Amino acid sequence: DYFDGSTLYEENGSGDTAVFRFGRAEVQSFLFSNLCFLANEFHIDGVRVIDMASALWYRANENRNCYGGGENLDGASFLRRLSLMAHKKLPGFLLIADGSAEWPRTTEPVKNDGLGFDFRCNQGFADGMLSYLGADEAGKSERYGELSYAQLYQYSEQYVLPLSHTALSERQPTLMGRLGYLPFEERIALLRAFFGFVTAHPGKKLLFAGQEFGMLEPLQLGGELDFSLLDFPSHRELQACSEALNAFYLEHPALYEGDGDTEGFTFLNCHSYEENVVVFLRRATSEDLLVAVNFSGTSYPRFNLG
């Protein structure tokens, strides 16, 4: 045998993503070993597995599994083994699934025919909310359904709400940059309301660095955060708001105990599209919290919450 230049570990695929041959023992050993090395030597707390679709599905009109379907059974089997291995050898280690793969029970235990991941990124929530934020007052009314859409599938998985680098870095505008249609102080006020909504919404929170104090320009690869903005009161106040919301979250079990339970969340008002106001309850065994968020630039001294 000799090396002829052909791929040993991955399939030849289109695009810039190499699809590993997950059924091969040497491939599994290579990937498992890399994960353990990163965890043990660099003390990482978890990994986000991106482009899950490439591992779980064959590309259109290419391979088929032994049953004639498009599912990559070797890929699914590998991900299950990965979760079992990680949770056994690396206590507390987090596996977070990302990508648009339509695969059920990603965060269900392997014994229940799931993939065994801890969380899945709710990219639909992020895309919808960024679209909503970027619209003017009339556009927000048209997109009002984005505020409640995630509830249609919220309890099918354990979700992370990913306002991450994927949507907010380099070529993508920051949260502040998406609000360019508003005067500066109104942008700050809208972000305070948005941060409050995300904090109270079911799902774990992921906010890309710099957004918490209102970065104006996207963070470039190899660049650094523009901490000089904290010399300005409005940016310091936004950072203080983010800090206060994090503390409030930790102090109130209603904001996290019922993330995966339909009893932990109830909409009281998800029909005030003209006012761009949404109202809901978060529940826990020890408390109930009433949450009202006004995304408009209008003050409502009297408002029917129900």
Residue ranges and their predicted role:
Residues 20-21, 25-28, 230-241:
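A short, structured beta-strand-centered segment in the mid-to-C-terminal lobe
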Residues 228-230, 306:
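A structural detector for beta-sheet-dominated domains
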Residues 233-258:
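Catalytic cores of secreted or luminal carbohydrate-active enzymes
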